[in-house]
């Protein structure tokens, strides 16, 4: 009996240790001018790429107060799912207020405010990686925010890669205000997409949802699920 009790206790300890490791989420902090190691709100990093790299296996990046980006932003690759949250993210590039996902893990924005320090348009380009706008996302009340499941232009790929017409996209919207949500691309082309765009709307306000592309192009398959929110056109 003692032997079995010992085995059970060892198994229980292993399970508890595994659960503890699973529950310990990696959190990194970042803001304008940060000079710390990112381990706390009082010691934030000053660079978003460095912050995301620290949670590449999965975790959360917390903006403390404000983070300003003067260039179009491209995430580093991250195997795990990441959450970008807190504070305010300010686009100041003007002509190229863009955020490109790096994948392959999902990127989720939640409880965050986006503002324009220059320009009046922003684009979130998923590049076929999962993109989620969770609860508490505030987008600029003036101007236009676009969410694109694939690329800006199908034939103008920002990565060293061939254009992808057979990939699936995954977008979920729970909050925020958007001028357009597009399953595959924004720019004009006459390509036919053979993948499936998956767009789920659980909240927020969207002027138009496009299953394929905003300007031209066609898709064989798209799945648009509207559970809640205000979608004016599909």
Which stretches of residues belong to each language-model region?
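Acidic Gly/Asp/Thr-rich repetitive segments characteristic of extracellular carbohydrate-active
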Residues: 31-64
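Surface-exposed loop/turn motifs in large extracellular/passenger domains
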Residues: 56-57, 77-83, 98-182, 186-208, ...
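Cleavable N-terminal signal peptides
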Residues: 10-11, 21
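Sec-dependent signal peptide cleavage junction
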Residues: 18-26
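Residue-level detector of conserved, well-ordered beta-strand and adjacent loop positions
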Residues: 30-31, 64, 85, 182, ...
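N-terminal extracellular ligand-recognition/capping segment immediately after the signal peptide
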Residues: 59-82, 86-97, 119
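Positively charged n-region of N-terminal signal peptides that target proteins for export
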Residues: 1-6
């Amino acid at each position: 009996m003692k032997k079995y009790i010992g085995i059970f206790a060892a198994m229980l300890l292993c399970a508890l240790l595994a659960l503890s490791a699973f529950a310990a989420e990696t959190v990194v902090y970042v803001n304008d001018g940060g000079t710390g190691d990112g381990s706390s709100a009082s010691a934030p990093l000053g660079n978003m790429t460095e912050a995301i790299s620290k949670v590449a296996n999965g975790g959360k990046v917390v903006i403390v107060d404000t983070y300003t980006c003067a260039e179009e932003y491209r995430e580093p690759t991250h195997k795990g799912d990441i959450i970008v949250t807190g504070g305010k993210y300010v686009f100041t590039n003007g002509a190229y207020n863009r955020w490109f996902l790096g994948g392959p893990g999902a990127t989720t924005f939640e409880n965050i405010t986006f503002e324009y320090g220059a320009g009046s348009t922003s684009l979130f380009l998923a590049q076929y990686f999962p993109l989620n706008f969770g609860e508490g996302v505030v987008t600029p009340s003036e101007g236009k925010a676009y969410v694109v499941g694939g690329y800006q232009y199908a034939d103008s790929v920002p990565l060293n890669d061939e254009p992808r017409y057979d990939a699936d996209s995954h977008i979920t919207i729970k909050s925020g205000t958007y001028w357009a949500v597009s399953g595959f691309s924004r720019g004009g082309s006459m390509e036919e997409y053979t993948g499936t765009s998956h767009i789920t709307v659980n909240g927020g306000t969207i002027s138009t949802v496009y299953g394929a592309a905003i300007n031209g192009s066609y898709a064989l398959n798209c799945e648009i699920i509207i559970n809640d929110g205000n979608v004016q056109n599909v």
